[in-house]
Amino acid sequence: MPSAQTTSRCCPSFIRNLMEQSWPVLRGGLFQLEAETAHQVTLRGLKIAKRLGMLGWLPPLAEAAPLTVAGLRFPNRVGLAAGLDKAGECVDGFGAMGFGHVEIGTLTPRAQPGNPRPRLFRLVEQEAIINRMGFNNPGIIEGRANASDRTFPGILGVNIGKNFDTPNEKAAEDYLLGLRGAWDWADYVTVNLSSPNTKGLRDLQQEESCRALIRTLHAEQKVLAQQHQRHVPVFIKISPDLEPDHRQGLARLFVIEKLEGVIATNTTLSRENTEGARHSTEAGGLSGAPLREKATAFVASLAKELDGALPIIGAGGIMSGSDAAAKLQAGAALVQLYTGFIYRGPALVRECVESCAVQAEAT
């Protein structure tokens, strides 16, 4: 008969296995709901689980091929991409799934409702999502308050953007407000220039605009680092739809300006591999399995162009452990999950952590 101590050690693993195995049933119920409603129900469930102390039933965050990126020690290679926890309400809930880092947002200086609903669509047979959310979020101040009680021991990223009614000529002011608002509680900040759902936002990826913004943010970094006696790395998230010469130009720019990291990629406007699917003609950014090959090829090309000068966080179409390992093989240092997590649940996190650890040890 096992001792109480043995039972105590086994319980967290048992609960995790039960959670992973029950996900298909839970997903079946959630997928009966409208996509955004299902998302809200999931977030509410995670908040209730935290309030009831149920997150403590799960195993503590384990290290697997830990890596230092931009001066931050990531306990494993797998993170949650921005977009699932826009308001920073469920950092501990998602962290309990085994993510080594959690990125919240996109947060803008002022709260905004985003685009009209419906704005989130499942392409179930293709294991894909189309969203045109439009940076719906409570604003950087509320995001800070929401995340203030977290106990998650991993890395916290804060994804920042501009408000929809801020013209591009004044976008830098919004990003400065976001950087200042996140500085004392974020481990890193991601500058989102690549969402297709805010009019004109992707224009900020043009080389001259991007150069000016990076220089403005880097100057502010120095001021904030001196004021707070801590450094917060700044990454930029870019689109998979960049033409090769545009991507190459940005890679040169990132190296010259000493950017600390790049997230590749955001969602795509392409509808390749979704032809004829229900909802495939909806406006918005496509994520999930149809983006997998495009995103991995993008990471591989970008890695060659950066030549190790700065780290890449690979995202886009990771639906299995082998997909995550392929991103590392292509040149990413870390990976992030979004749509794959919606379709496969917590089991995908563990699978990706294990596959990435094997891939990291082999290289």
Each predicted region: which residue ranges?
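An N-cap/entry alpha-helix motif that binds or orients negatively charged groups
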Residues: 18-67, 131-136, 140
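Glycine/Thr-rich beta-alpha phosphate-binding loop at enzyme active sites
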Residues: 47-49, 54-61, 196-209, 252-308, ...
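Short beta-strand/loop segments at the ligand-binding rim of alpha/beta enzyme cores
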Residues: 72-79, 153-158, 224-242, 305-314
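Catalytic cores of alpha/beta
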Residues: 87-94, 242-254, 308, 318-335
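Glycine-rich phosphate-binding active-site loops on the catalytic face of alpha/beta enzymes
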Residues: 103-112, 193-195, 261-269, 318, ...
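A gly/proline- and charged-residue-enriched helix-loop-helix capping module
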Residues: 105-154
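C-terminal helical cap(s) of enzyme catalytic domains, especially alpha/beta-barrels
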Residues: 112-127, 273-284, 340-363
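Active-site glycine- and acidic-residue-rich loops that bind
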Residues: 163-176, 203, 209, 235-256
